[in-house]
Amino acid sequence: MAREFLFTSESVTEGHPDKMADQISDAILDYIIERDPNARVACETLLSNGFAIIAGELKTTTYAPMQDIVREVIREIGYTDALYGFDYRSAGVLNGVGEQSPDINQGVDQAGGEIGAGDQGLMFGYACKETDVLMPLPITMAHRLTQELANARKEGVLPFLRPDGKAQVTVQYVDGKPKKIKTIVISTQHDPDVSYNRLKDAVIEEIVYKVIPKELIADDIVYHINPTGRFVIGGPQGDAGLTGRKIIVDTYGGSCPHGGGAFSGKDPTKVDRSGAYAARYVAKNLVASGACEKATVQIAYAIGVVEPVSIMVDSHGTAKVPDEKLEACVRDLFDLTPRGIIKTLDLLRPIYRKTAAYGHFGRELPEFTWEKTDKADEISDYLKIR
C-alpha cells in the first residue's frame, strides 16, 4: 500500500523583521569584505519599534558607516513611510560592535596561510530531485510565493501590499514523491483601507497562480489568506527582528537536519556559513552526478582545527553504490578545509546580501557558487557509474 503523508515548509518576505535583520547584517559584511577581503566579521542585528541595534565583533582595516548601511537596507526593503510602522529616516541606530577576541583570531589565522575553523560546529547539506534546482518542493514553492509578494508590491501590481509577509506550503507525498500542493497559507501586511475579499482574491490571482504550476494545485486545495482577517501593523512595529532566527527558512524548510548555526553577518571563515555552503555543494553534485536520488551531507569542525573532524553522507537508500563509497569520494574530491572551501567557492566577495532573503540554496544566481554542479562528472568517473 502506498505511503502517503503531508509535509510543510515556510518562507518569509524581505520585509519580515527577522529577515530585515539578516539583510542588515549581511549588508555590513558585504561593505567590509569588499574593502578588506581578509576581515573577520560577526555582525548581529536587533530591530524593534523604531530602532536598530548592531552588535558583534570585527577585525578589519576599513571603516564601515553603520548608520548609513542600516538605513539604506531598510529603505530598499520598502519601509519608507512612518505609516508602515518603521521608517528608514527616523529609526534610531545604535552601533555596539567591538573587536574580535585575539584568542579566537590566533586559532583561525595559522602559519602557512592555513585557516582554522572559526568555531566548532556541525553543518548539513541536502539535495534531491524534487525540483530542477535539486531542492525540496515545499520550500521552493514557499520562497517563490514570498518573492512574488515583494515583486507585486514593488512593481505596483498590488499597491496595497506592505513589506512584511509570510507563506507556507503543504505538499502531499506518495511513496516519497511530491504529488500535489494541498494547502497554501499567505499572510501579508497591507494598507488599512483594502477589503479582505479584494486582498484575498488578488493574492490568489496575482501571486499563487503566477508562480505555482497548475498541475501541482490539488483539486481540493485550501487557501488561508491572512487568516486572522487583518494585517496592518507589521515589520519591527509588530514583532522584534533578530539575525539568525530563520535558519530553517534559510536552508531546506525542515526537509533535513540543521546544525543550529545561522549564516548572516558571518565572514566565510565561520564554518557555520561556509561549511553549510560546502555541504550543499557536495550534496547537489552527488545528486547531479546520478550517484543517488537524494543526499544528506554532514560536516563537523573543531575551532582552530583545519580539517573537518567528520564527514557523513546519507543517500536515504537511493544510491548506486554504498554510502561509504560516497563518503570516500567526497573526501578525495572535495577540499573541505575552511581555506579550501573559501577558494573553491570564491567566498571572499561581497555576495552575501543577496543570500539573506528567499533562501541561501536553490537559487542559481552567478554569485551562488555552491549551486554549481561542476563536480558531477568527476564524481561519476570516480564512482564508475556512467
Swiss-Prot record:
GO biological process assignments: one-carbon metabolic process; S-adenosylmethionine biosynthetic process
Cofactor: Mg(2+); K(+)
UniProt keyword Zinc present: no
Record: residues binding K(+): 44
GO molecular function, one term: magnesium ion binding
Subcellular localization(s) per the UniProt record: Cytoplasm
Superkingdom, taxonomy of origin: Bacteria
Enzyme Commission number(s): 2.5.1.6
Pfam families to which the protein is assigned, alphabetical: S-AdoMet_synt_C, S-AdoMet_synt_M, S-AdoMet_synt_N
Protein residues bound to ATP: 16, 164-166, 230-231, 239, 245-246, 262, 266
Pathway assigned in UniProt: Amino-acid biosynthesis; S-adenosyl-L-methionine biosynthesis; S-adenosyl-L-methionine from L-methionine: step 1/1
UniProt-annotated binding residues for L-methionine: 57, 100, 239, 270
GO CC field: cytoplasm
SUPFAM superfamilies named in the record: S-adenosylmethionine synthetase
Subunit structure: Homotetramer; dimer of dimers.
Similarity field: Belongs to the AdoMet synthase family.
Protein name per Swiss-Prot or TrEMBL: S-adenosylmethionine synthase
Species for this entry: Nitratiruptor sp. (strain SB155-2)
